[in-house]
């Protein structure tokens, strides 16, 4: 690996706050070089967030740097250890099996850690090759940035770097890696690891690190660790509410894939809801349907129970740890979900019966299965006060999503009756709804089409999707084709944990 002085431009100096923890928490090691790397896609928004110099972005060495082939100034690469529950079963020790934390950058926009996912074997690889493939790396890159555009808390992605190195999965694919960016990558499973080993000292060291680095306000609480658990519970509730509101399904909500910062983490077999089915399984490795759309709020709460159990040695009143989760998570999820759904439905002010109306709406969607994203986007354009032929003409695009149009008309009548209870200028309401209901989401078929071209070294669709998904609530008529229903060829697409 080349030394930092070989870099073409001055690079912001890294620090690695996680490396200040004892070495039991990680293994220091350098990324394994990726031969002859090349750039597949770059998020200039994330580059700006990091304050990367333009000369570096345009440099031929950029791919070498973010393939892990060049050491960055101040970088102390490491792979972290953690454990976790996978599909509801204790899996024991896991860890960064192919991710290398390069370090962090601090600027006026915050503290940002950069992690290379797919940078080679670590002591936690459990026999795997430590690589990621082009397919999964493009999916994670695009979805990270798409979720940011949607306003959902998420890790970010700076770039995808590819190589022609073959790797074996279900078939031979080519290696790639994604440079992930977040304030931190500590997981629920990071705490479970030490709790499962009765290592209270390390458990407290980790909690202190999280408080001091990310949540200093917790230090002023009567019990800082109880405050931290409640903070994580609240942020997780808000996160899951955002997922549900945009129709996002994570696909593999294991405790090692849950961020203590309330961020969407580890994009694998994810999906966005199309024809609405609350029982949809987006991960074909999820044979029991544990991670369906409807189950996500319950699974997140179960994961928080696992975290609360890990926190027990730190709490003054351990007997109420799960009660704290129930109260904090439950309230945060319910309040955030109601607020987001009221915005999607154009309800100016929440009324006591809105929870029932929202529930009835989801029952209606379940029965008739329109496309989730198109339903709410087209609803956003409807008037609350037209009559007769004018209303029928305005309603036609939404009604076209239904076989049973009489049922659609009946629901629309109920919706308009609810709108009348909190009057709002039609134009203002429509603008508000359009800002709450995206036109564009990263449908699996869109990602698949871009991946197929990328395998032929054509990355134009990766860039086109990235550009579009930065502003998913804007009309962007030049991207109308990306808002279409899935084509026939996409009906058999499946995604799994293989990456």
Curated annotation (Swiss-Prot):
InterPro entries: SelO. Its EC number is 2.7.7.-, 2.7.7.108. The active site is at 256 (proton acceptor). Its cofactor is Mg(2+); Mn(2+). Mg(2+) binds at residues 257, 266. Keywords: ATP-binding, Magnesium, Manganese, Metal-binding, Nucleotide-binding, Nucleotidyltransferase, Transferase. ATP binds at residues 95, 97-98, 117, 129-130, 180, 187, 266. GO terms for molecular function: AMPylase activity; ATP binding; magnesium ion binding. It catalyses: L-seryl-[protein] + ATP = 3-O-(5'-adenylyl)-L-seryl-[protein] + diphosphate; L-threonyl-[protein] + ATP = 3-O-(5'-adenylyl)-L-threonyl-[protein] + diphosphate; L-tyrosyl-[protein] + ATP = O-(5'-adenylyl)-L-tyrosyl-[protein] + diphosphate; L-histidyl-[protein] + UTP = N(tele)-(5'-uridylyl)-L-histidyl-[protein] + diphosphate. It is an enzyme of class 2 (transferase). Belongs to the SELO family. Nucleotidyltransferase involved in the post-translational modification of proteins. It can catalyze the addition of adenosine monophosphate (AMP) or uridine monophosphate (UMP) to a protein, resulting in modifications known as AMPylation and UMPylation. This is Protein nucleotidyltransferase YdiU.
């Amino acid at each position: 690996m080349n030394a930092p002085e070989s870099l073409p431009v001055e690079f912001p100096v890294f620090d690695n706050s996680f490396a200040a923890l004892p070495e039991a928490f990680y293994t220091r090691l350098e990324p394994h070089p990726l031969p002859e790397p090349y750039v597949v896609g770059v998020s200039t928004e994330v580059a700006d967030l990091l304050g990367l110099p333009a000369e570096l972005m345009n440099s031929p060495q950029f791919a070498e740097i973010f393939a892990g082939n060049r050491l960055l100034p101040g970088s102390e690469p490491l792979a972290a250890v953690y454990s976790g529950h996978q599909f509801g079963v204790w899996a024991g020790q896991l860890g960064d099996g192919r991710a290398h934390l390069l370090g962090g950058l601090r600027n006026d926009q915050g503290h940002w850690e950069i992690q290379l996912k797919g940078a080679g074997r670590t002591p936690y690889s459990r026999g795997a090759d430590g690589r990621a493939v082009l397919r999964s790396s493009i999916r994670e890159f695009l979805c990270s940035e798409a979720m940011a555009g949607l306003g959902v808390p998420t890790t970010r992605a700076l770039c995808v770097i590819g190589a022609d190195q073959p790797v074996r999965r279900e078939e031979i694919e080519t290696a790639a890696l994604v440079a992930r960016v977040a304030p931190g990558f500590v997981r629920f499973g990071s705490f479970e690891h030490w709790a499962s080993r009765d290592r209270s000292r390390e458990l407290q060291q980790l909690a202190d690190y999280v408080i001091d680095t990310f949540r200093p306000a917790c230090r002023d609480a009567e019990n800082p660790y109880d405050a931290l658990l409640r903070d994580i519970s609240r942020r997780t509730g808000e996160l899951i509410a955002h997922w549900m509101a945009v129709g996002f399904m994570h696909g593999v909500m294991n405790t090692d894939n849950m961020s203590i910062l309330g961020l969407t983490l580890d994009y694998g077999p994810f999906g966005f809801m199309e024809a609405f089915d609350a029982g949809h399984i987006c991960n074909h490795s999820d044979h029991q349907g544990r991670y369906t759309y409807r189950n996500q709020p319950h699974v997140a709460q179960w994961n928080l129970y696992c975290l609360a159990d890990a926190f027990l040695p730190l709490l003054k009143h351990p007997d109420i740890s799960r009660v704290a989760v129930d109260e904090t998570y439950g309230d945060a999820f319910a309040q955030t979900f109601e607020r987001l759904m009221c915005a999607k439905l154009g309800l100016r002010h929440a009324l006591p019966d809105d929870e029932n109306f929202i529930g009835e709406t989801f029952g209606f969607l379940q029965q008739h299965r329109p496309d989730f994203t198109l339903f709410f986007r087209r609803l956003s354009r409807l008037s609350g006060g037209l009559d007769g032929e004018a209303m029928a003409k305005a309603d036609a695009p939404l009604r076209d999503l239904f076989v049973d149009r009489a049922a659609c008309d009946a629901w629309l009548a109920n919706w308009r009756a609810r709108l009348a209870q909190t009057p709002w200028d039609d134009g203002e309401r429509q603008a508000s709804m359009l800002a709450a209901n995206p036109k564009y989401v990263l449908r699996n078929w869109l990602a698949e089409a871009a991946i197929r071209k990328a395998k032929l070294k054509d990355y134009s669709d990766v860039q086109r999707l990235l550009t579009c998904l930065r502003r998913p609530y804007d009309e962007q008529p030049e991207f109308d084709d990306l808002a279409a229903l899935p084509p026939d060829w996409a009906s058999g697409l499946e995604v799994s944990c293989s990456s």
